[in-house]
UniProtKB/Swiss-Prot annotation:
Self-association and partners: Part of the RNA polymerase complex.
Organism: Methanothermobacter thermautotrophicus (strain ATCC 29096 / DSM 1053 / JCM 10044 / NBRC 100330 / Delta H)
Keyword field: Cytoplasm, DNA-directed RNA polymerase, Nucleotidyltransferase, Transcription, Transferase
HAMAP family in the cross-refs: RNApol_arch_Rpo11 (MF_00261)
Entry similarity comment: Belongs to the archaeal Rpo11/eukaryotic RPB11/RPC19 RNA polymerase subunit family.
GO biological process: DNA-templated transcription
EC top class named in words: transferase
Role according to the record: DNA-dependent RNA polymerase (RNAP) catalyzes the transcription of DNA into RNA using the four ribonucleoside triphosphates as substrates.
GO terms of molecular function: DNA binding; DNA-directed RNA polymerase activity; protein dimerization activity
Name of the featured protein: DNA-directed RNA polymerase subunit Rpo11
UniProt xrefs under PANTHER family: DNA-DIRECTED RNA POLYMERASE I,II,III, DNA-DIRECTED RNA POLYMERASES I AND III SUBUNIT RPAC2
Pfam families given in the database record: RNA_pol_L_2
GO cellular component, one term: DNA-directed RNA polymerase complex
Signal sequence interval, chain numbering: none
Length: 85
């Protein structure tokens, strides 16, 4: 992960070695946060491009951390459901 833009209300991050999967779920969770004004990602080239996630919020770092924690919690819940089968 490399931060390429870090301003008070904006942040852009490159996720090396990742694909749509991680960025799309993070974007979705970020947009559930009322403090997030915008969240989007792009991949310049489908084969060799690295995803870039853009966040505009009151505190993008706090919003990203909260989104990551929410994702972890949802993954833990999913794992428990699968294990209970």
């Amino acid at each position: 992960m490399e931060v390429i833009l870090d301003k008070r209300n904006e942040m852009e991050i490159v996720f090396e070695g990742e694909t749509h999967t991680l960025c799309n779920v993070l974007r979705s969770i970020l947009m559930e946060d009322e403090k997030v004004k915008a969240a989007a990602y792009s991949i310049d080239h489908p084969i060799v491009g690295e995803p870039q996630l853009y966040i505009r919020a009151g505190s993008p770092k706090k919003s990203l951390k909260a989104a990551a924690e929410t994702l972890r919690d949802r993954c833990d819940e999913f794992r428990r459901l699968i294990e209970s089968l």
